[in-house]
């Protein structure tokens, strides 16, 4: 049996990330990952950089941003438009294009101490048509647990692992509800 470890939700300099795809791939190799999927916000600019870099499979998709939900799409030829209110329409459009789609950070809570509390949870879940869901978005979970500036500073600079102990239970329960159908 083969086990492949990777990350399906990474941003580069093409949106709000801080590294080039080359730098991200080198870091992924150092961390022992087999693959990464670059999903910059509403852009496919990284597509020419797909391939194998530093022994890591690098794929490029997009995070389709809407106020009521964010959706990771892979194998898109162009960005999919979607209704702001109806996530099912977004899921259907991505699927009809032949792409794979994943619900991103479905239970994101945010913190008033970080980015003025902005978060992008899903308020309505699709019936079907998606490939999967992001069970654990470390950054979203971390931000949701920041309840003071002091705590944020301590966790960020001295003990990043203290705030996060695993995927949110509600995400696991949602996945279980879909897979038990």
Please identify what each model-predicted range represents.
Residues 1-181:
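A metal-dependent hydrolase metal-coordination microenvironment
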